């Protein structure tokens, strides 16, 4: 059995760790609330924009997506992996990295590159795959304009023919304990499908509907990427809060076990001392 000093040192170490994880849990909980409010407010806008684009497209004949819907033979694929800049968030980053690798294997025999958004994804994926860019600084000041600039870069890579397909891989936020890895086709634009009936009312449009659609598509792409990053950002804080909650609980259990071990060891030491004293006294009597 470890001596009392070693056990006391372990209790002190575990207690210190518990304080750190508890503090990180509270910080993540505060950040989660703000991030959750942002993605909750974002989703209705994204859904309405998609609905508007769908209604306009349904009332037009032929290909109205222009260069954004161009279907080419898939030879070069760009996977946009959205992770975090920091760890200690459970399997949050691992799941995205694993899915990005799975998509790379799916396109075996083709050129597959990675566009990393987040330091953790860049650090791991760059070891086995080609990472052409890392936009980890976007999380320092997460705004629509900053994300829009990234979306424009991705769009240009597709329009110029540098890549034939671009996909997004990220964690979709459900709640603090649940994040679902999503893979979405970014470009070319996939046909918009919906179970809801399409409204094709008789409206007067200015400018023409096809011009409006071509104006809305870049906006929709920027919104799609912004929503994905916002989802990932909220998922990160939810995953970290959950991980730190579990770590705090485990540290508490370990501390309690160590205290029990310490008390047993201390009791055994005291008992041995008493026995030695009694034995010595009996020896003197004899």
Question: Which residues fall in each region the model found?
Answer:
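C-terminal beta-strand-loop-alpha-helix "lid" module of Rossmann-like NAD(P)-dependent dehydrogenases
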Residues: 1-286
């Amino acid at each position: 059995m470890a001596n009392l000093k070693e056990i006391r040192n372990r209790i002190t170490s575990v207690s210190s760790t518990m304080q750190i994880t508890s503090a990180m849990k509270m910080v993540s909980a505060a950040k989660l609330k703000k991030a959750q409010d942002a993605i909750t407010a974002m989703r209705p806008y994204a859904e309405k924009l998609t609905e508007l684009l769908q209604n306009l497209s349904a009332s037009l004949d032929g290909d109205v997506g222009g260069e954004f819907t161009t279907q080419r033979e898939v030879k070069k694929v760009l996977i946009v992996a959205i992770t975090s800049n920091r760890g200690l968030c459970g399997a949050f980053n691992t799941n995205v990295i694993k899915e990005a690798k799975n998509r790379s294997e799916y396109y075996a025999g083709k050129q597959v590159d990675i566009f990393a958004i987040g330091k953790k994804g860049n650090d791991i994926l760059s070891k086995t795959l080609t990472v052409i860019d890392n936009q980890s600084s976007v999380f320092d000041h997460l705004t629509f304009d900053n994300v829009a600039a990234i979306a424009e870069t991705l769009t240009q890579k597709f329009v110029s023919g540098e890549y034939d397909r671009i996909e997004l891989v990220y964690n979709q936020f459900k709640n603090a304990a649940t994040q679902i890895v999503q893979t979405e086709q970014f470009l070319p634009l996939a046909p918009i499908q919906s179970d809801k009936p399409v409204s094709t009312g008789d409206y007067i449009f200015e400018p023409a509907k096809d011009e409006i659609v071509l104006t809305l598509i870049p906006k929709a792409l920027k919104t799609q990427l912004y929503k994905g990053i916002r989802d990932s950002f909220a998922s990160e804080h939810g995953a970290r809060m959950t991980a730190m909650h579990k770590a705090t609980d485990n540290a508490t259990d370990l501390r309690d076990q160590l205290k029990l071990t310490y008390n047993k060891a201390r009791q055994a030491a005291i008992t041995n001392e008493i026995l030695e004293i009694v034995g010595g006294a009996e020896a003197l009597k004899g």
